[in-house]
């Protein structure tokens, strides 16, 4: 193996730059050439590749987003399109590809592997929705961004004695909502893993809190449930307490990565190169029990949700 390429795909996550830096510098240290691919699989199809060196990744570990840019590429599901991508990689002399992203990005990597390109995936998504790894790159930073926002919302919620319903990211995974809820002392946490929730029970919880002296309530809602605006109107109507909805949106994706995300991304990126040099392909890198691990992509994606029911139950007790 002489040359590898690296791309970021799907939604951006803080810490992606730290991972890029780790891959590039580890690869160069091992005597490999490195190429960056701009704008994910879409950029790959357009031949947007460029040579990278140590200087290319100087002063980026503290930056949010991704210097390689990112994009979604639904056409990559077409095998003929993927064959075109392989021809482009071959034309540049690329032997292996490191992909930073989520499950969709990993599927693209797996399919490229079947066409002869060695691939390794790094988990870059704020949702923490890849069950094979304890944490994904970007989760910790997004969590801290959310908690900071909740703290500010709580200030105004307290002043106005109102209910604040805060919607956070997490389409199929409630980890952000759960961890943010317990970190901020929320009165209720609503996540997709717990099934359909009872709006009337939520209203009773809020009224019970008021009867015990609570002057305001914070409710954290995962976007996979959605409907924050509608829920706030329902709560206000049934409880008689003013309620407001806040959808945090893309602020959760931005900002300088936390120290934890920088360390995680650096460890994962370095291991990705080591696994490639061992001749492995179609693998993903993750962390379990603070140990860096690698696993077959299919096996990793087949693992069911790792939602922490024990932590949810702790949050339920502490919110009363």
UniProtKB/Swiss-Prot annotation:
Keyword Repeat applies: no
MF annotations from Gene Ontology: 6-phosphofructokinase activity; AMP binding; ATP binding; fructose-6-phosphate binding; identical protein binding; metal ion binding; monosaccharide binding
Record-given protein name: ATP-dependent 6-phosphofructokinase
Subunit structure: Homotetramer.
PROSITE patterns reported for this sequence: PHOSPHOFRUCTOKINASE
Annotated Gene Ontology cellular component terms: 6-phosphofructokinase complex
Family: Belongs to the phosphofructokinase type A (PFKA) family. ATP-dependent PFK group I subfamily. Prokaryotic clade 'B1' sub-subfamily.
Binding site for Mg(2+): 103
EC number per UniProt: 2.7.1.11
Pathway it works in: Carbohydrate degradation; glycolysis; D-glyceraldehyde 3-phosphate and glycerone phosphate from D-glucose: step 3/4
Domain of life: Bacteria
Residues the entry annotates as binding ADP: 21-25, 154, 185-187, 214-216
Notes on activation and inhibition: Allosterically activated by ADP and other diphosphonucleosides, and allosterically inhibited by phosphoenolpyruvate.
Required cofactor(s): Mg(2+)
Function: Catalyzes the phosphorylation of D-fructose 6-phosphate to fructose 1,6-bisphosphate by ATP, the first committing step of glycolysis.
GO BP: any one term: fructose 6-phosphate metabolic process
Active site: 127 (proton acceptor)
Entry binding sites for substrate: 125-127, 162, 169-171, 223, 244, 250-253
Residues where ATP binds: 11, 72-73, 102-105
Annotated organism of origin: Clostridium botulinum (strain Eklund 17B / Type B)
EC class of the enzyme, as a word: transferase
Compartment annotation: Cytoplasm
Keywords: Allosteric enzyme, ATP-binding, Cytoplasm, Glycolysis, Kinase, Magnesium, Metal-binding, Nucleotide-binding, Transferase
Catalysed reaction equations from the record: beta-D-fructose 6-phosphate + ATP = beta-D-fructose 1,6-bisphosphate + ADP + H(+)
């Amino acid at each position: 193996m002489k040359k590898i390429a690296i791309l970021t795909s799907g939604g951006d996550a803080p810490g992606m730059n730290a991972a890029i830096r780790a891959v590039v510098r580890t690869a160069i240290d091992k005597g490999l050439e490195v190429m960056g691919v701009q704008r994910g699989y879409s950029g790959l199809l357009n031949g947007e590749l460029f040579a990278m060196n140590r200087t290319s990744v100087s002063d980026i570990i503290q930056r949010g987003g991704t210097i390689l840019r990112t994009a979604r590429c639904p056409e990559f599901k077409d095998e003929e399109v993927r064959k075109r991508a392989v021809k482009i990689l071959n034309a540049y002399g690329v032997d292996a590809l490191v992909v930073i992203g989520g499950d969709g990005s990993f599927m693209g990597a797996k399919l490229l592997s079947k066409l002869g390109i060695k691939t390794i995936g790094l988990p870059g998504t704020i949702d923490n929705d890849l069950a094979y790894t304890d944490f994904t790159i970007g989760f910790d930073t997004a969590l801290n961004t959310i908690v900071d926002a909740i703290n500010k919302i709580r200030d105004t919620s307290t002043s106005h004695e109102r209910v604040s319903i805060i919607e956070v990211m997490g389409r199929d995974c409630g980890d952000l909502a759960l961890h943010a809820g317990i970190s901020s002392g929320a009165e209720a946490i609503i996540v997709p893993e717990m099934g359909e929730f009872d709006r009337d029970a939520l209203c009773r919880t809020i009224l019970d809190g008021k009867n015990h002296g609570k002057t305001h309530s914070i409710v954290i809602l995962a976007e996979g449930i959605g409907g924050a605006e509608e829920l706030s109107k329902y709560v206000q109507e049934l409880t008689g307490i003013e309620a407001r909805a806040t959808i945090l949106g893309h602020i959760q994706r931005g900002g300088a990565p936390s120290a934890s995300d920088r360390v995680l991304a650096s460890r994962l990126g370095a291991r990705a190169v080591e696994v490639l040099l061992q001749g492995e392909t179609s693998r993903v890198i993750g962390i379990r029990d603070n140990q860096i691990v690698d696993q077959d992509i299919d096996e990793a994606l087949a693992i069911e949700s790792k939602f922490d029911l024990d932590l949810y139950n702790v949050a339920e007790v502490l919110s009363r």
